[in-house]
Amino acid sequence: MKWEVVIGLEVHAQLSTQSKIFSGASTAFGAAPNTQACAVDIALPGVLPVMNRVAMEKAVRFGLAIGATVNPVSIFARKNYFYPDLPKGYQISQFEKPIVEGGQIAIRVGETERRINLTRAHLEEDAGKSLHEEFEGSTGIDLNRAGTPLLEIVSEPEMRSAAEAVAYARALHGLVTWLGICDGNMQEGSFRVDANVSVRPEGQAEFGTRREIKNLNSFRFLEQAINYEVQWQIDLIEDGGKVQQATVLFDPATGETRAMRSKEDAHDYRYFPDPDLLPLTVTEADFAAVRADMPELPGEMAARFVESFGVPELDAAQLTQSLDVARYFEAAAAASGQGKLAANWITGELAARLNREDMALAACPIAPERLAGLLVRIADNTVSSKLARQVFDALWDSELSADAVIERDGLKQVSDAGAIEKLVDDAIAGNPKAVEEFRAGKEKALNALAGQVMKASKGKANPAQVQDILRQKLAG
């Protein structure tokens, strides 16, 4: 039997605010346990929540960016459940009337591009954190995180593979960081993914029973967890078993999921409107202020890169996955006048070096204007593409310009026809077998001769001229 995979994601994005959603306590990460939890956060009797309007503005920004309906009036509700790190015994969330409804996220898997519909995005408070490993035989509770503003972003169950789910999560991560509403730090829990996974026979309209994989904090774990869970469900059903709705955890050490508890439905949480909070209103002035502060969106910028710099669509999409990368590219392309070359170097050599150094682009020692200087010299044939990598390495390790490095290290490309012709004559005279093979129709023999010329010139000869002169000489 052929099976179809059905995946929907719930993403919890911590909003980048200075204070918590219903109190003035700090949201800074890394403070000593329980030093950033005020009376509201720990639910002392008599305290009342006060809405942080900055969190509302960030939710509105997200809604506008995805083409969603942003409700002018939304309602906070109490989600009732007991857990040690939830002091009130309920979580303030949104249920029947969220701030954002609908919208779409564009994803690309290979050459295929499609759009994933969103169900909703709602504001809520984060819970505290249970610390199991630090205390032998007991559990510690850190309430610093309690009350941190979250935007829970819920997709429709439209993804059909782990690859699509990862593409969606990456696109969403890129968007919330682009918009400046979330720092996206998955290691610190700023962007956490829950995956609802089920399988059904191909062609069946009814969904299978889903299991929810909780708190995945890397794209690699998301892919591994979904792939394992899909195969586990298929094996269970084919062996005559039945999938039970459950919440499961993924163990990175074993690559397996394991059931944590039976999965609750909405009625289990006994939602009702929070009597301590007025309906959240977004005024026309609020909408206008958010629109005025909206950055150019990734899709819009990618289209402009194609139009203004002649960059291929795939490269433009890659360059606009991060606002930092997009801005770096635009500065380098504008300064050099070499859009395609800038795209190739930024997505190739620069990205590889940053990856090797485990470094963010913000810490890159080569400013876009310095890279532009190198691109200009590649374009005007002052330096060959091969020797340009040596120049790039020197730029990384120094504050010199590309021109200064080329001059200092004698890397200027030899484009003098007479000088190259002499090197070609020497290569032909010294490699009669390669000459004979080329004239017999073996094209690869020409590359061997060109390699000898490049070796003799220490990589400085203009490769295109070398090829042209070789062909002229060997045709005679």
Curated annotation (Swiss-Prot):
One of its GO terms (biological process) is glutaminyl-tRNAGln biosynthesis via transamidation. It catalyses: L-glutamyl-tRNA(Gln) + L-glutamine + ATP + H2O = L-glutaminyl-tRNA(Gln) + L-glutamate + ADP + phosphate + H(+); L-aspartyl-tRNA(Asn) + L-glutamine + ATP + H2O = L-asparaginyl-tRNA(Asn) + L-glutamate + ADP + phosphate + 2 H(+). It is an enzyme of class 6 (ligase). It comes from the Bacteria. The keyword Protein biosynthesis applies. Its EC number is 6.3.5.-. Belongs to the GatB/GatE family. GatB subfamily. This is Aspartyl/glutamyl-tRNA(Asn/Gln) amidotransferase subunit B. The gene is gatB.
